[in-house]
């Protein structure tokens, strides 16, 4: 955990539904941060039924990184939320759902999103080191797969990016202090 650091400031009133749901993903990321985990958060929002009927968008699942806490390489925010959403809906197909995540999904998470048949993915910050929704490769829109997801990126980019930057700066500072001790 980064001690003594201010939490990123976020606009008090989101202007769009995407911003409102991304704010909830940021809240999830802060839970990871409080555990000393990489601050990545995710929510899954159902927007329509399997029959295609539009419904009032509702959060059906939340997740945040817990890899270190659980000693589990699969405990990413997206995987946790996808598992919960499948349980809520009683089906592995998450058609009619949008995934909101503070950092661009890695290859594993992008693959799970495709397998779950999600309609859309909304990303806060892109991930130049492991991003699989356009930064390094784009598994979410790979035409050879049987499913592609629409991507919206950059929703509340600044607070999402700042949270990651401050987290890793804190890790580097702690390592430097340890070496100098």
List where the protein language model places each region:
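A structural microfeature
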Residues: 60-61
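Zinc-dependent deaminase
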Residues: 1-32, 49-54, 105-181
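Immediate flanking context of iron-sulfur cluster ligation sites
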Residues: 91-103
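A short, polar/charged loop-to-alpha-helix boundary motif
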Residues: 69-79
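A short, polar/acidic, helix/strand-boundary loop motif
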Residues: 15, 67-68
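Short hydrophobic alpha-helical segments used for membrane anchoring or interfacial signaling
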Residues: 43-48
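Short loop/turn microsegments at loop-to-beta-strand junctions
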Residues: 16-17, 38-40
